[in-house]
């Protein structure tokens, strides 16, 4: 005769995978419900999870600005922490102000099984020191802050606020000696604005965590970005498509003409002006030692 056991509650997909002794990392992921998700977000998450199931370790999500990249990341991260063995995820931001925004979005995200806020379920830590709480499930920080955590070196406030976009040609930071985190500390790394954050000076920091699967978020992928993610773009939702779908509105260009933009101008002898090295973003204040005329066509030239 068949045997049965009375169940007080229905098993979750994660519990069913364990009972069936299915060891695949993503076996416990349930079918994603489209509730409250935009079509582009729904497709991005479905394609992301499918990509990981197929063995990919890096995936790029390209969503137009305004389409909800961070909300998409919140949903994807919640599902990874809830339905897979992942226990710690890093959310890399380009600057501290973006980190504070992300912390706020995770704090209000409640598209969870029971409607609880993400930060009430999983400990979310926005790093402001060189210590990572061992109990943290989601760690938010800049790559500069992550470097300070690894090496134990304190950062100056302006270093943590500096965009990595201006460091693409800088000398790479070196990781030497005893590092303070193992290379398998994070199960996943999600890189916000990934066209900025993963190259140049700080690339070695990201390369150190070679056990983690990596997810990139951007609206403007470069060829270098695509190459880093092995050309595995799981979503490509353009601005034009978002306008057609009514998520964004088309722009109107109003050209404002000034005397300088029409005819040019001049920098007087002894007048101070700022020189900017476009490649590095380096700025320095200079005093003109003679009259410097410029034409309208000289404006904004590199």
Located regions from the model:
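Short glycine-/polar-rich loops that comprise or flank the Walker A/P-loop
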Residues: 85-87, 135, 185-186, 210-213, ...
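Alpha-helical scaffold elements adjacent to nucleotide-binding pockets in ATP/GTP-utilizing enzyme cores
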Residues: 76, 101-106, 201-208, 228, ...
């Amino acid at each position: 005769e068949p045997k049965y056991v009375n169940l007080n509650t229905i098993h979750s997909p994660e519990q069913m995978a364990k009972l069936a002794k299915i060891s695949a990392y993503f076996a416990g992921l349930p079918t994603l419900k489209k509730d409250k998700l935009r079509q582009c977000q729904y497709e991005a998450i479905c394609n992301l999870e499918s990509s990981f199931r197929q063995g990919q370790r890096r995936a790029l999500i390209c969503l137009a600005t305004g389409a909800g990249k961070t909300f998409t990341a919140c949903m994807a991260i919640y599902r990874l922490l809830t339905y897979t063995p992942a226990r710690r995820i890093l959310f890399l931001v380009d600057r501290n102000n973006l980190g504070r925004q992300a912390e706020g979005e995770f704090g209000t995200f409640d598209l969870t099984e029971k409607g609880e806020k993400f930060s009430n379920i999983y400990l979310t830590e926005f790093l402001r020191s060189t210590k990572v709480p061992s109990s943290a499930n989601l760690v938010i920080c800049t790559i500069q802050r992550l470097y300070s955590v690894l090496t134990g070196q304190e950062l100056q406030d302006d270093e943590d606020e500096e965009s990595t976009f201006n460091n693409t040609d800088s000398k790479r930071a070196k990781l030497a000696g005893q590092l303070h985190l193992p290379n398998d500390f994070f199960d996943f790394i999600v890189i916000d604005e990934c066209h900025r954050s993963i190259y140049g000076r700080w690339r070695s920091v990201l390369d150190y965590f070679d056990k983690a699967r990596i997810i990139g978020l951007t609206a403007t992928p470069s060829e270098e970005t695509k190459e880093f993610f092995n050309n595995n773009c799981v979503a490509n939702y353009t601005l034009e498509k978002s306008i057609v779908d009514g998520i964004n509105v088309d722009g109107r260009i109003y050209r404002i003409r000034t005397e300088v933009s029409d005819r040019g101008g001049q920098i007087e002898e002894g007048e101070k002006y700022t020189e900017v090295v476009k490649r590095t973003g380096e700025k320095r204040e200079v005093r003109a030692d003679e009259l410097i005329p410029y034409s309208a066509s000289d404006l904004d030239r590199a």
